[in-house]
A protein has these predicted regions:
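An N-cap/entry alpha-helix motif that binds or orients negatively charged groups
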Residues: 1-70
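Conserved, mostly hydrophobic/aromatic
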Residues: 19, 76, 97
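Hydrophobic faces of well-ordered beta-strands that scaffold small-molecule active sites
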Residues: 74-77, 104-106, 126-130
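Glycine-rich phosphate/pyrophosphate-binding beta-alpha loops
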Residues: 78-84
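Alpha/beta enzyme core
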Residues: 81, 94-95, 119-120
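Glycine-rich anion/phosphate-binding loops
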Residues: 84-98
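Active-site-adjacent beta->alpha loops and helix N-cap segments on the catalytic face
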Residues: 86-88, 106-124
Length: 130
């Protein structure tokens, strides 16, 4: 796969490249997966209105979330045990979120401490899952 154009492309690539145990953990939801299925169904229901022949020169995805300026209205959600995928997984994700101007949420099940993540991002604010 030379070009990734959607989340499904990433999932297919991960299934080929990531050890099975780690892939299964990341690709699944917890317990009965009811929230996972509900999220998938809700996501499928989102439709974007096409705007043809509209000047896009001054468009921006920037907005605010919880009073903070963000580059776009998305955030990295908490993912438990990200360190199973990469030893510094949470810190790398927090740095990426900072670089792209979006919020990062540290999981309660993180293998990295709040202090380590804060230091890794130069004290950049992030959210914490309680």
């Amino acid at each position: 796969m030379s070009v990734i154009t959607c989340i499904e492309d990433l999932r297919v690539l991960a299934e080929k490249r990531v050890p099975r145990m780690f892939y299964d953990y990341a690709d699944a939801g917890s317990w009965t997966e009811s929230t996972y299925r509900a999220n998938e169904a809700d996501f499928q229901g989102i439709k974007f209105r096409q705007r043809v022949a509209v000047n896009m020169d001054n468009r921006s995805t920037a907005t605010t979330m919880l009073g903070e300026r963000v580059a776009m209205p998305v955030a990295i959600a908490p993912t438990g045990l990200t360190g199973m995928q990469h030893a510094d997984g949470e810190m790398l994700a927090a740095r990426a979120a900072k670089q792209f101007g979006i919020p990062f949420t540290l999981s309660t099940m993180s293998i990295c401490s709040i202090e380590d993540v804060s230091e890794a991002t130069g004290g950049h604010p992030f959210w914490f899952q309680l």
